[in-house]
């Protein structure tokens, strides 16, 4: 049976220096070893020496979208000025928690920005490749752009629930009903295609 896991908080006294030597996530003061992190207490000893006392965090640090990063996101809502999205991946790394992002009307494509209509570019539920252009505003939204040929909608479903196929840079078609819908279609690069 495994020994019970002991959790500790920063500043908690773990043991005296006669019982162990300090490891990562700890510091010494007045002959005692203290925790410098919130995490699990670990003791490891080799060859009968004093055990090394360390504190290890449970989870690794959260990956964050950075300016210039290519992200995969899902459209949650749209209006005439922008599309709201949830960022799910940074590059090919999945995020533990999704982040909110916004694709503004003027950031949808590089040309004819004044003619862009959000509802002809994205729909709720679409999976979109986008690039982070700013870390956002007071609502903690990341500002994203799809103003490159390689960025835009990569997966979309028709009203009948069938995954659509891109037929041009601005249209996708349902293979079952053959209805066409407008989207800002991404030209997916070969390295992102799964075989």
Curated annotation (Swiss-Prot):
Name of the protein described by the UniProt record: Exosome complex component CSL4
Entry's family note: Belongs to the CSL4 family.
Record-annotated S1 motif domain positions: 66-147
CDD domains associated with the record: S1_CSL4
SUPFAM superfamilies found in the cross-reference section: Nucleic acid-binding proteins, Ribosomal L27 protein-like
Gene Ontology BP annotations: RNA catabolic process; RNA processing; rRNA processing
UniProt function note: Non-catalytic component of the RNA exosome complex which has 3'->5' exoribonuclease activity and participates in a multitude of cellular RNA processing and degradation events. In the nucleus, the RNA exosome complex is involved in proper maturation of stable RNA species such as rRNA, snRNA and snoRNA, in the elimination of RNA processing by-products and non-coding 'pervasive' transcripts, such as antisense RNA species and promoter-upstream transcripts (PROMPTs), and of mRNAs with processing defects, thereby limiting or excluding their export to the cytoplasm.
SS bonds (residue pairs): none
Organism of this sequence: Homo sapiens
Pfam families per UniProt: ECR1_N (PF14382), EXOSC1 (PF10447)
Record flagged with keyword Cytoplasm: yes
Subunit structure: Component of the RNA exosome core complex (Exo-9), composed of EXOSC1, EXOSC2, EXOSC3, EXOSC4, EXOSC5, EXOSC6, EXOSC7, EXOSC8 and EXOSC9; within the complex interacts with EXOSC6. The catalytically inactive RNA exosome core complex (Exo-9) associates with the catalytic subunit EXOSC10/RRP6. Exo-9 may associate with DIS3 to form the nucleolar exosome complex, or DIS3L to form the cytoplasmic exosome complex. Exo-9 is formed by a hexameric base ring consisting of the heterodimers EXOSC4-EXOSC9, EXOSC5-EXOSC8 and EXOSC6-EXOSC7, and a cap ring consisting of EXOSC1, EXOSC2 and EXOSC3.
Phosphoserine, modified sites: 21, 98
GO CC field: cytoplasm; cytoplasmic exosome (RNase complex); cytosol; exosome (RNase complex); nuclear exosome (RNase complex); nucleolar exosome (RNase complex); nucleolus; nucleoplasm
SMART domains the record matches: S1
Disorder named in the UniProt entry: Pontocerebellar hypoplasia 1F: A form of pontocerebellar hypoplasia, a disorder characterized by structural defects of the pons and cerebellum, evident upon brain imaging. PCH1F is an autosomal recessive form characterized by hypotonia, global developmental delay, poor overall growth, and dysmorphic facial features. Brain imaging shows pontocerebellar hypoplasia, thin corpus callosum, cerebral atrophy, and delayed myelination.
Source taxonomy: Eukaryota, Metazoa, Chordata, Craniata, Vertebrata
Subcellular location: Nucleus, Nucleolus; Nucleus; Cytoplasm
Name of the coding gene: EXOSC1
Keywords: Cytoplasm, Disease variant, Exosome, Neurodegeneration, Nucleus, Phosphoprotein, RNA-binding, rRNA processing
GO molecular function, one term: RNA binding
